[in-house]
Amino acid sequence: MKKVTFVIQGPLCIDSIRNIPNYKRLGDVVVSCWDTDSPELFELIPDYVTVVKNKFIDPQDYNFQNIRYQIKTTLEGIKEVQTPYIVKVRSDEYFTRMNNFVSCVYNFPEHITVSNFLFRKKYMFHPSDHVFGGTVGNIARMLEFSLEMIGDFYRDEKVDVERVGLSKKYTFPILTAEMTFCLSYLKTKGIDVVADIQGMSFKELKEYHKKTIKENYKLVRASDMGYFLLRFKSNPIIEEPTAFTNEQDFLNFHIGSIKSLEEL
């Protein structure tokens, strides 16, 4: 019996559909997409895949970085999961060899496993959210807490981090999906970051951040996940890439990504 389910979430994309057999070798597969997706793409999904066709929503609430879309499709996909573990992947990305990632999820069930793509050293509480894995319960609770966290924000609002109790001195200035998921995941572990860091010096904060992330996250490098496609669609500079297929390219990219949690 398989112990992990890959939940491919988001609008259907040929890139992830053609990679489904690679996921199937390791576990079950659920595709959670939208009822507005191309019928031709639905026909390409193998019969062994569970498909969740969500009614497309035009959210009137906060949806910066499409966070509400990501939460909606992932949670709806989780409802169809019959295994104790889940790996969430974006529908516009793929990884051809997930053995190391899945092994990490199995070996460290009380952690959340992520990749190093855009896992930035410069900003605290900003782990990558492109692919993540863990127990079904932990991932679901993280997403539910995230919905609560963004519940009072407006549709097109960009939220300054000060509004959630953090500071631009050490975090990204705008509340991102990555930060929302991080604070929410730590909350599932009984960790209240905002309360904990009150009155800390920068040195104490840096030590707290590294210790907290290392105790609750595991990292698998993209170079250990076979051939891959990772997107950076929000890149505002048109002369720069919006996708990466080589780890060294994004390690050299000016935004920066770590190779190990020891770099934090």
Describe every region a protein language model picked out:
Residues 1-15:
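N-proximal low-complexity "stem/linker" segments adjacent to membrane-targeting elements
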Residues 11-13, 33-40, 116-120:
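Short, polar loop motifs at secondary-structure junctions
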Residues 12-25:
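Short, well-formed alpha-helical segments that are part of the catalytic scaffolds
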Residues 32-80:
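Active-site-proximal specificity loops/subdomain of glycosyltransferases
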Residues 34, 89-91:
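Active-site acidic Asp-centered loop
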Residues 71, 91-105:
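Acidic donor-binding/catalytic loop of UDP-sugar-dependent glycosyltransferases
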Residues 86:
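Short aromatic/hydrophobic "clamp" motif used to bind/position activated sugar donors
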Residues 95-98, 112-262:
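Catalytic core and acceptor-binding pocket of nucleotide-sugar-dependent glycosyltransferases
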